[in-house]
Amino acid sequence: MSSVKLTEYSHGAGCGCKISPMLLDEILESTQKTSVYPQLLVGNANKDDAAAYDLGNGTSVLSTTDFFMPIVDDAFTFGQIAATNALSDIYAMGGKPLMAISIFGWPIDKLSADVAREVIDGGRSICEDAGIPLAGGHSIDSPEPIFGLAATGLVDNANLMQNDSAKKGCYIFLTKPLGIGILSTAQKQKKIEEGHIDPAIQAMTTLNKVGADLAPLESVVAMTDVTGFGLLGHLSEICEASDISAQVWFEKVPLLPNVEKYRQLGCIPGGARKNFASYGDKISEMTQQQREILCDAQTSGGLLVIVKKDGLEAFKKVTEAAGLTLEPIGETTVKSQHLVEVL
């Protein structure tokens, strides 16, 4: 393990580096005429996790990319987290990854090739866990360390998960606890106690493979992963695309250990503030605690799954087989004044 602390070389951390939802909408808004591609089943219209291109044989190719600056100090672990996060988009669409190529930026005048190799090795280890090759990539000399993947996957068209397919009257489940942004900020501010970051690292390096097993279930109607826009941001995207609203039961939302402790110490990532500024007007009134946790920018977060209430038995059979014990954190409702109501 290298003694280099990678977070000292980056201004942001993980998915907290994301451009705010509000500014991203402004950037992507274009008056340029675009062509229509009938085979493109999923593009950028509803802010889905990956693009889907119909092969004409009942399956689609999934394509996605994700990269960011270090969220942890250890190079190998950074590579693992970045790769896990990138592959999550494939699983969130109901697919399975086929291969990946790396996206790599490195400050060659500040950090050695040995440390860079550890990052790549970490990413490769996760690809091995997913059963796919890290088949190549592209690298540049950059002011800050950057790593991620461009991933390709396959999905049966019948199992393709999209943001616009949620229905009212369903339960909402989350497969990983929240608080990654708060704990990683505590680490960056050197306030974290020994061992307290470990549960976050465990969560961030756990692949969301269960998504591919959940997608074929008739009771699972929509799915996305919770990353840089926080739980409320990604749930809002589903509600907006599906023309519904949702309730979140705050006391039922799972949290990583010690999140509240570091929240009270002021370890709030800038991404949480950017998130609330972007979509806070679409959410019901919240306490400061609710706002700082539910808008917390996650890196390699869990899957947000919308499940019909009459299909819970099949859903729980799959999740329990994956080692998950889940309870609903809310439900979808008919469209109302707010996209999401926090109770």
Swiss-Prot record:
Mg(2+) binds at residues 49, 89, 225. It holds the Pfam family AIRS_C. One of its GO terms (cellular component) is cytoplasm. Its EC number is 2.7.9.3. The record marks 18 as: Important for catalytic activity. The active site is at 15. Binds 1 Mg(2+) ion per monomer. Keywords: ATP-binding, Kinase, Magnesium, Metal-binding, Nucleotide-binding, Selenium, Transferase. It catalyses: hydrogenselenide + ATP + H2O = selenophosphate + AMP + phosphate + 2 H(+). Coiled coil: none annotated. GO terms for biological process: selenocysteine biosynthetic process. Its cofactor is Mg(2+). GO terms for molecular function: ATP binding; magnesium ion binding; selenide, water dikinase activity. It is an enzyme of class 2 (transferase). ATP binds at residues 18, 46-48, 66, 89, 137-139. It comes from the Bacteria. Homodimer. Belongs to the selenophosphate synthase 1 family. Class I subfamily. Synthesizes selenophosphate from selenide and ATP. This is Selenide, water dikinase.
